[in-house]
Amino acid sequence: MKVLKDKIWQYEKHGIDGEVELFGVNIFDYKWEDTKEIAKECDFPIYKVVIDGKEHEFATGEVSNNVWCFYLPKE
């Protein structure tokens, strides 16, 4: 996987598997597409998801059993 250096990734939230709201929806209800890139700040894989026709990016990793940490690109 390549490390993405162009964007700065910022901590957004953490939560239990199946119960995290990102972009106004439960992110676990959507299919995540692995971009094969890594966010430098957190060393997590970057994913893309399409919600209501709009593509969003986030980085995430499971930091404990069923506990996920999410980062978003800083605007």
Question: Which residue ranges define each predicted feature?
Answer:
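Short intrinsically disordered terminal tails
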Residues: 1-2, 73-75
